[in-house]
């Protein structure tokens, strides 16, 4: 049996075991500890997993389970494909990245990421700048941080990720509901999450580190 470990993210030290599907057909998800940190992992037979739509969805679903575990956990997410040769290699990477991981956990403690796309019903009508200003003001005051994502369509006027404290989540939800009610058919709101805060952490792990080189 392979000792390879697929890694979803890092949390404060805690023993967690989830009987849920993992990437590449894994049947359970559990934690590997290094000092005050725990990596959320599952077993895998390779250090170079194939990226499929199904497994990307599984990766995100596992992170959502951790986010919601026993009232909610703060998690520093790893990008898809972070698989390590064995537990020793993983712990070595955690040791080297400990300060960055600790800083990231502190920065996002008690938060989730929420995605908001606003699409106009036509290219005419309400000013796009006015929509951006109005919605931006409403949502910015309910969030800790935000990032701008690509506006890949002329009708896409807002595409942002928001870092929101868990205790402001209901307020943020209510603001989205109000926006939908007030703008009616003029806008379509695509509201997603909660997600692990991918857009608000910046930790890089190279292929050589994954393979223990």
From Swiss-Prot:
GO terms, biological process: gas vesicle organization
GO cellular component entries: gas vesicle
Chief location category: other
InterPro entries linked to this entry: GvpL/GvpF
One protein family per Pfam: GvpL_GvpF
Ranges annotated as spanning the membrane: none
Induction: Transcribed from early-log phase, decreases as cells enter stationary phase, probably as a long gvpF-gvpM RNA. Highly expressed in 25% salt, poorly expressed in 15% salt, no gas vesicles are formed at 15% salt. Accumulates in exponential but not stationary phase (at protein level).
Compartments, record wording: Gas vesicle
Entry function: A minor component of the gas vesicle, may be involved in preventing GvpA aggregation during gas vesicle nucleation. Gas vesicles are hollow, gas filled proteinaceous nanostructures found in some microorganisms. They allow positioning of halobacteria at the optimal depth for growth in the poorly aerated, shallow brine pools of their habitat. Expression of a 9.5 kb mc-vac DNA fragment containing 2 divergently transcribed regions (gvpD-gvpE-gvpF-gvpG-gvpH-gvpI-gvpJ-gvpK-gvpL-gvpM and gvpA-gvpC-gvpN-gvpO) allows H.volcanii to produce gas vesicles.
Quaternary structure, from the entry: Binds GvpA.
Further facts: Encoded in a 14-gene locus called mc-vac.
Protein family according to the UniProt entry: Belongs to the gas vesicle GvpF/GvpL family.
Name of the protein described by the UniProt record: Gas vesicle protein F
Species in which this protein is naturally found: Haloferax mediterranei (strain ATCC 33500 / DSM 1411 / JCM 8866 / NBRC 14739 / NCIMB 2177 / R-4) (Halobacterium mediterranei)
Lineage: Archaea, Methanobacteriati, Methanobacteriota, Stenosarchaea group, Halobacteria
